[in-house]
Every structure is written in structure tokens, then in C-alpha cells.
Curated annotation (Swiss-Prot):
Signal peptide interval: none
Biological process according to GO: translation
Function (record text): Forms part of the ribosomal stalk, playing a central role in the interaction of the ribosome with GTP-bound translation factors.
Source species: Rippkaea orientalis (strain PCC 8801 / RF-1) (Cyanothece sp. (strain PCC 8801))
UniProt-recorded name of the protein: Large ribosomal subunit protein uL10
HAMAP family, per the entry: Ribosomal_uL10
Alphabetized Gene3D superfamilies for the sequence: 3.30.70.1730, 6.10.250.290
């Protein structure tokens, strides 16, 4: 029994919603993968906030038709396609897929789309190598903390320097008085 028109419209609406939440989408050829292997890929992607959707190319084509950000995906819609839609952790999702691809050796990367740009596998790997949002936030926090620490040390150093200078004044005065006294004794003798 085929899909009804309403059912097809619901599938397309679901794809549009998934795409609206995604930062990156890439298309893979899933020819030769078993159901358990697709499930394994989905399980690997789940912790990264990504999903693997298997649907007809025509449904995906209809879903991206009106959205300029995803239009370039149409060039990858041939053969048996699975769509990895990455919501949060781009690097983690790409690494999860690469690990799966290495383990199964049955899937091929066709291409990806991010911010309206078609990407090849090397470009997607380069994006995956960038630090995650959490890593960048940690680096920024560390830099800000370093600045605050240096500022606090600098602010504390000013009164400490003044205090050392004030403590040095009586000793310096004493040495000056002794030097003058010694000079006068030397002149008197």
C-alpha cells in the first residue's frame, strides 16, 4: 500500500523541521548496510545531537526546494541516500560517522551542505577538526581568567611597591645620616 498524499506531506514537513534545526547536513550512500548497521550509526550519532534519516530522495528534494540554505543538497540526491542532520556537535557527528565508515567499509560520503554551501568530504573533515563550542568557551574563559589574574596581581603590586618604598625610607635615611656623620668625622680628624 502506497503513501497517501497527507502522509507524504507529513514526511516532507518533518524533514523541513529537522533541517531548520540543523547546522550541517550530509548525504551518504547506505547501499549494502543492514538495518542493524543503520541502527548502529544512529546510536553513534545520538550523543552528538545528530540524526540519520533514511528517506526518498524526492521527499528530501521537496523539503529543500524552498530553502536556499539547503538547495545545494539536491546535487547529492542520487541512489540510496541517508541523510545525517547535525544539530549541535558538528565535529563529534563527523567523527562518529568517520568511525562508523572505517568500521563497516560499506558507506560512501556524497557531500554536505552548511550555510548554503556544498561541501566535499575534505571540507566537512576540516570543519570537524575545529574546536567545539564548549572547547572554545573554555579557551575564552581561560584567557579571561588569565587577564583577571594578571590585573589583580598588578593592582596588588602597586600598594606593595609603595609599602616597600616606605619601609626603605627609614633605612635609607639612616644610611644617609651615617654617611654624613662619617664624612663629618673624617673632616674633623
Amino acid at each position: 500500500m502506497g503513501r497517501t498524499r497527507d502522509n507524504k506531506a507529513a514526511v516532507i514537513a518533518d524533514l523541513k523541521e529537522l533541517l531548520s534545526d540543523a547546522q550541517l547536513a550530509f548525504v551518504i550512500d547506505y547501499q549494502g548496510l543492514s538495518v542493524s548497521e543503520i541502527t548502529e550509526l544512529r546510536n553513534r550519532l545520538r550523543p552528538t545531537g545528530s540524526i540519520c534519516k533514511v528517506t526518498k530522495n524526492t521527499f528530501m528534494e521537496m523539503a529543500v526546494q524552498e530553502d536556499d540554505n539547503w538547495q545545494p543538497m539536491t546535487q547529492f540526491l542520487t541512489g540510496s541516500s541517508a541523510f545525517v542532520l547535525v544539530k549541535d556537535d558538528v565535529g563529534g557527528a563527523v567523527r562518529a560517522y568517520q568511525g562508523f565508515k572505517k568500521d563497516t567499509k560499506k558507506t560512501e560520503f556524497r557531500g554536505g551542505v552548511m550555510q548554503g554551501q556544498a561541501l566535499n568530504e575534505d571540507q566537512v573533515k576540516a570543519i570537524a577538526d575545529l574546536p567545539s563550542k564548549e572547547e572554545l568557551m573554555a579557551q575564552i574563559a581561560g584567557a579571561l581568567n588569565s587577564i583577571a589574574t594578571k590585573l589583580a596581581v598588578g593592582i596588588n603590586e602597586v600598594p606593595s611597591s609603595v609599602a616597600r618604598g616606605i619601609n626603605e625610607v627609614p633605612g635609607s635615611l639612616g644610611r644617609v645620616v651615617n654617611a654624613i656623620a662619617n664624612k663629618e668625622e673624617g673632616n674633623a680628624a
